[in-house]
Amino acid sequence: MSKHIAGPEIERLIQLLARIPGLGPRSARRAALHLIKKKETLLEPLGAAIQAAVQKVCICSVCGNVDTIDPCSICTDPRRDDATIIVVEDIADLWALERAKTLAARYHVLGGKLSPLDGIGPDELNIAPLIQRVVQNPITEIILAVNATVEGQTTAHYITDQLSNFSVKVTRLAHGVPVGGELDYLDDGTLAAALQARTNL
């Protein structure tokens, strides 16, 4: 009995889908079958969209975001606050902040976080280009929107130290109780951060 249940093209589709984060082999098979069943309405448009992305998507040379133009749509948006840069670890973090629609600032994607154990030092991240942006532009505030992990906080402290000689305000996202969160369900570290970052009413 053959170990393959379909032709090599379908097997290849399943293998590639299984490499997407959150999709294992079983989910990939289901997704592939769904795409094949909806060939004209889903598989073909998806293939065309992927092909267009391969040809047009690029990394913004200013902030590190992905877009189909360089500089990206955010960097060229005249409605943005040029004096404020939000620093994020990854493009996914940038997109998350954009969904919040709270602050129309500029961004800077580091491309990761400092992690000596993994061999990731300052030279492996986009820290030098961030400093260069501060040197070349009238930046008044850097918002460090890094994750509340040991590596994220180490990265934040390193960047703060690198910016200490510039007349720029460095802030970070508040840590603590999430909206709708109940104290009884929060971990000790989150509660401690919330107490330290308490505000007046």
Curated annotation (Swiss-Prot):
Keywords: DNA damage, DNA recombination, DNA repair, Metal-binding, Zinc, Zinc-finger
Record keyword Zinc-finger present: yes
Tagged with keyword DNA damage: yes
Top-level lineage group: Bacteria
InterPro entries, per the entry: DNA_Rcmb_RecR, Rcmb_RecR, Rcmb_RecR_Znf, TOPRIM_dom, TOPRIM_RecR
ZnF C4-type: positions: 60-75
Annotated Toprim domain residues: 83-178
GO process terms (BP): DNA recombination; DNA repair
Coiled coil: none
GO MF, one annotated term: DNA binding
Function: May play a role in DNA repair. It seems to be involved in an RecBC-independent recombinational process of DNA repair. It may act with RecF and RecO.
Family the entry assigns: Belongs to the RecR family.
Name this polypeptide is given: Recombination protein RecR
